[in-house]
């Protein structure tokens, strides 16, 4: 791991039980990686890729459980894409693109000497996972797509475009929680007040005497050209690149990005796909509930059997 260095800002790990690494991308930008557990565990390692404006803190609960499994300990890492979390912000917003972000993932995998791994991709992170399956299939030993598939619903993308980079600045995390609740209550009606506060703490960060978004507001440019009358090209070829490895899809039943018709089409191409339906959640499921974590734990154990024979 000569190309990865320990955290310069240990507070990024906080009290979460994870450690931080920084990796330099091909263009010199600094990429932040969270890690739970230790390399060389009995189970396959796991690489987590967050959503559009999200960062590796979204995988805190899941990462801690998977890494700390006494029977099957494993190394879990989560990559903050450029412009998110602890990674550097790009002075050229055009670099917030799939080709550049895929190159960043490959740079991190090389720097930390990651072997074949199970990839958990939320939303945009799931698209990157499908692209990785086409670009470097040997890197992947199993996949969990969190509320994403080969077809993205324009209506949902338009909803995201309405607030990404445009939310008002809260004076406290409690006020931020109320902002998020107003935006997301229809998709996440069962979340408690403390859940919204946790999400606020994973959306904004403390800067000076106030709060700022924990992502580059210029990420809004990635959605600027969305046209509800012109759906994005489907990614079926990239989805099919995952055919040789176990596959799970987590579906928020209130989602407006991944819909049932797309899941049915995915099932038609992959009869063995494991679909986990999450009630009372939309885009994207939080992966924090005990029942969801238990299902994911069982799935990654099956990936171990498939790849390692135990």
Question: Residue locations for each model-derived region?
Answer:
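A catalytic-pocket lid/entrance helix-loop region that shapes and gates access to the active site
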Residues: 142, 148-175
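Conserved serine/cysteine hydrolase catalytic core
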Residues: 206-265
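Catalytic histidine-centered segment of alpha/beta-hydrolase-like enzymes
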Residues: 281-290
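An N-terminal hydrophobic leader/cap segment in hydrolases
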Residues: 1-22, 34
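Conserved alpha/beta-hydrolase catalytic His-Asp/Glu region
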Residues: 171-224
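Active-site loop/oxyanion-hole signature of alpha/beta-hydrolase fold enzymes
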Residues: 61, 67, 72-120
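Conserved hydrolase catalytic core segment
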Residues: 115-154
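Conserved HGGG/HGGXW glycine-rich cap/lid loop of the alpha/beta-hydrolase fold
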Residues: 29-88, 304
């Amino acid at each position: 791991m000569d190309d990865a260095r320990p955290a310069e800002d240990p507070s990024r790990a906080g009290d979460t039980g994870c450690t931080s690494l920084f990796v330099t991308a091909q263009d010199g930008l600094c990429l932040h990686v969270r890690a739970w557990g230790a390399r060389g565990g009995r189970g396959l390692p796991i690489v987590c890729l967050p959503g559009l404006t999200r960062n590796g803190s979204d995988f805190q609960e899941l990462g801690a459980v998977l890494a700390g499994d006494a029977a099957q300990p494993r190394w879990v890492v989560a990559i903050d894409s450029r412009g998110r979390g602890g990674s550097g912000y790009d002075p050229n917003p055009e670099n917030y693109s799939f080709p550049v972000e895929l190159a960043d993932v490959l740079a991190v995998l090389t720097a930390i000497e990651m072997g074949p791994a199970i990839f958990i991709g939320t939303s945009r992170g799931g698209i990157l996972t499908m692209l990785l399956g086409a670009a470097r299939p040997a890197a992947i030993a199993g996949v969990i797509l969190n509320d994403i598939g080969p077809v993205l619903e324009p209506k949902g993308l338009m909803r995201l475009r309405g607030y990404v980079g445009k939310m008002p600045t809260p004076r406290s995390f409690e006020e931020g929680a109320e902002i998020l609740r107003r935006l997301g209550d229809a998709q996440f009606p069962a979340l408690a007040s403390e859940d919204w506060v946790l999400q606020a703490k994973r959306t904004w960060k403390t800067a000076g005497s106030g709060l700022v978004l924990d992502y580059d507001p210029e990420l809004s440019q990635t959605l600027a050209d969305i046209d509800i009358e012109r759906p994005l090209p489907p990614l079926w070829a990239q989805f099919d690149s995952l055919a040789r490895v176990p596959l799970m899809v987590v579906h928020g039943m209130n989602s407006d990005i991944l819909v049932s018709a797309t899941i049915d089409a995915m099932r038609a191409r992959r009869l063995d796909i494991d679909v986990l339906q999450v009630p009372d959640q939309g885009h994207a499921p939080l992966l924090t509930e005990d029942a969801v974590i238990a299902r994911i734990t069982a799935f990654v154990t099956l990936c171990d059997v498939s790849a390692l024979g135990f």
